[in-house]
Amino acid sequence: MKLNELRDNEGAARKKKRVARGPGSGKGKTAGRGIKGQKSRSGVALNGYEGGQMPLYRRLPKRGFSKPNRKEYAVVNLGLIQKFVDAGKLDASQPIDENAIVAAGVTSHKRDGIRVLAKGEITAKLTLTVAGASKSAVEAVEKAGGSITLTAPAAAASAE
């Protein structure tokens, strides 16, 4: 096979339907838009506008509250950390902090900190320093002979 022999699979690339090109095309005159009215013109309608009727987004009550100082943690699972330890990208003999986790490529960003969850198996004896961890993640690391130190004050209080 050569570059000049490459082709799309049959039916993969559909040809654009050219409209308003005479009655023989099947899409002549009104080009499949019907007759007159706002929808037959260019620009069509504004999303959410219901012709003067009170729109749905205004008929329903406002709900909820967004905390202005909410912390957003990057989630990392134990199984993924173990995978990086096995691959040699994280050194289990050294203390592992959030910067080491990001540098190894376990997660691309740490946002307001890293929260460790217990999904997956952990066999390496790790010393982790992170912003948060689930109770089951703390138990799993301690069972493997390691330890987790929590840096976020709220997370440290909730894990105890």
UniProtKB/Swiss-Prot annotation:
- Chain spans, region Disordered: 1-51
User: Bias category Basic and acidic residues: which stretches?
Assistant: 1-13
Q: Which domain of life is it from?
A: Bacteria
Gene3D superfamilies attached to this UniProt entry: 3.100.10.10
Q: Where is the composition biased (Gly residues)?
A: 23-35
Keyword Magnesium assigned to the entry: answer is no
Assembly and partners? Part of the 50S ribosomal subunit.
Question: What HAMAP family does the entry give?
Answer: Ribosomal_uL15
| Function text | Binds to the 23S rRNA.
Q: What's this protein's family per the entry?
A: Belongs to the universal ribosomal protein uL15 family.
- Put simply, this protein is called Large ribosomal subunit protein uL15
- Please tell me the species this chain comes from: Cereibacter sphaeroides (strain ATCC 17025 / ATH 2.4.3)
Instruction: Show the taxonomic lineage.
Output: Bacteria, Pseudomonadati, Pseudomonadota, Alphaproteobacteria, Rhodobacterales
